[in-house]
Regions:
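Conserved Nudix-box catalytic region and its N-terminal flanking loop in Nudix hydrolases
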Residues: 34-74
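Charged phosphate-binding loop/patch that engages nucleotide di/tri-phosphates or the phosphate backbone
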Residues: 137-161
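Active-site-adjacent beta-strand/loop module that shapes the phosphate/pyrophosphate-binding cleft
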Residues: 22, 33, 89-113, 117-129, ...
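Functional cleft and adjacent loop/helix regions within the main domain
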Residues: 54, 60, 104-106, 112, ...
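Residues embedded in well-ordered beta-strands
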Residues: 26-28, 36-38, 102-104
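Acidic, metal-coordinating catalytic segment for phosphate/diphosphate chemistry
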Residues: 1-26
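A generic structural motif
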Residues: 30, 42-43, 106
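A short coil-to-beta-strand element that immediately follows conserved catalytic motifs
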Residues: 79-89
C-alpha cells in the first residue's frame, strides 16, 4: 500500500555547535520480487545525465528517515511500503560539514515512478549491473568492496527468506 505525502519546505542546513552541518540522504530501492534496484537519471545542472539514487537534503526539524521518506515521495510520486530500511553507508566530508546517509529500502515490487522535474529517466537494474554513467559519489560508493559485499548479502538474505 502506497502513501501520499505533502510537499515540504526547501532544504536547510542543520546548525550544530555554530557550524553548518549539511545532511542529505539517499535510497537504493530494492524490489524483493525481482532483486533489482531503482536508479534515476538526473536532469539538473549538477551532474546531469548521470544515474543516481532517490534522495536529497535533510530539512530542519526532520530526522534522516523522515527526509528519506519525503524524498522518495517527491522524486518518484509515491511512497511504496518499505518492508526494511537497511543502512548502507554514512559518508562524512573531510571537514565534517557534510554527511550523506545511504540506505537500501526493500519494497515488494518494482513500479513505474512519476518522476519529478529533477529526473528524466529511470531503470531497475540487477545488484551487480549498474547503469552508466553513475553520479560520481554513487560510483565511489558502489565500487567500494565493503558496500558491494553488503548489497550482495542483502540480496542473498532476501532470496533465502
Amino acid at each position: 500500500m502506497a502513501e501520499k505525502l505533502g510537499r515540504s519546505l526547501q532544504g536547510r542546513p542543520v546548525v550544530n555547535n555554530n557550524l553548518k552541518l549539511f545532511k542529505a540522504c539517499g535510497a537504493l530501492l530494492l524490489a524483493n520480487k525481482t532483486k533489482r534496484l531503482l536508479f534515476l537519471l538526473r536532469d539538473n545542472d549538477t551532474h546531469s545525465n548521470t544515474w543516481g539514487l532517490v534522495g536529497g537534503k535533510v530539512e530542519l526539524q526532520e530526522t534522516v528517515i523522515q527526509a528519506l521518506h519525503r524524498e522518495i515521495f517527491e522524486e518518484v510520486g509515491v511512497l511504496p511500503t518499505i518492508n526494511k530500511t537497511i543502512p548502507l553507508e554514512l559518508f562524512r566530508s573531510d571537514d565534517g560539514n557534510f554527511e550523506y546517509h545511504t540506505f537500501v529500502c526493500v519494497i515488494d515490487n518494482e513500479f513505474i515512478p512519476e518522476l519529478s522535474d529533477e529526473h528524466k529517466g529511470y531503470c531497475w537494474c540487477d545488484v551487480d549491473s549498474f547503469p552508466k554513467p553513475l553520479h560520481p559519489g554513487l560510483w565511489s560508493s558502489l565500487n567500494n568492496e565493503d558496500i558491494q559485499q553488503k548489497l550482495n548479502t542483502v540480496k542473498d538474505v532476501l532470496e533465502i527468506a
